[in-house]
Amino acid sequence: MSESIFRKDATAQGVAKQRLIETLAEPEERIINDPYADRFVLGASVIKFMGHRLNVWLAQKLVPGFHEHLISRTRFIDDLVKKNSASGVEQYVILGAGYDSRAHRLELPSSLRIFEVDQPEVQARKRSKLPEELSNLENMTYVAVDFTHQTLTEQLINAGFDQNKSTVFTLEGVSQYITKEALSSTIKEVAALTQRASSTFFISYVSDLFDKNPEACFGKGYPNAEKRAKLIMYGSAKVGEPWISFYSAEEIENVLSQHGYSVKENVTMKDLNSRYFAPVGRALSENQLLQLEHFVMAESQN
């Protein structure tokens, strides 16, 4: 697995910002709740002062549907992790965890062993922002990996990962930043780690149409789709994290199947708009849909 799997602070903070904005919504309207997101966001007090509606309105002016897209991804993974842990899955590995807060904000069973994998400096920064009692949960282990002389496999096993136990792995918002070879290598290593037990793998990826025909990744009538696509990519490159890899559904399915995984679900914001936002009266119209990422859940075939 490549060191480039790990993102810099800007991306992790940007996702945490959207979680904070969503948390400011009325309880009966919000899709996710993250009481810790403000700890990771610069200017959190200003965002709180502005409130949910104004922040979302501003986001819609810049890139319509962007906030909802990231929140739907967060909720999709939340549901996946909760469902698997409730059904008896014993371990949860968060690859490139960044400022992920699921170990703290979701009501997961204490029997679920959680491993957060990231670079040492990222983990140190994250832990310094959390209350001490949350930074030292008994069922949670921080797995720091320095790829100059360590591997994911050895560090996970050294941290207590049990290769005989069922596991959920999540790789959220990362695939577009790393080479296709690095992604394949990561999946291969995960598959080898869990060949004696069942495993579920979540991955998000950016459609190859976003690179070839960006308008196809937006809803009908979306304003200035190509311009917005360039804005998204420019913003990421500006903070030193350019998007370099795009995939078709067939390509993702092939790389997963090569390593023993079968795709069970592949959805976009269009699917999750009706699943999450419509029931609380916040459904986006067709011309607000941003479908640049696909969210995939795959299961091992062993």
Task: Name the predicted role of every residue range.
Residues 146-149:
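Conserved SAM/SAH-binding loop
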Residues 1-93, 99-143, 163:
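Rossmann-like AdoMet
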Residues 159-182:
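A short SAM/SAH-binding and catalytic strip from SAM-dependent methyltransferases
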Residues 8-10, 210-302:
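Rossmann-like AdoMet/SAM-dependent catalytic core
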Residues 151-154, 177-196:
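A short, conserved alpha-helix within the catalytic core of class I
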Residues 90, 199, 262:
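Short acidic/polar active-site loop segments enriched in Thr and Asp
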Residues 168, 192-209:
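Conserved beta-strand signature within the Rossmann-like core of class I S-adenosyl-L-methionine
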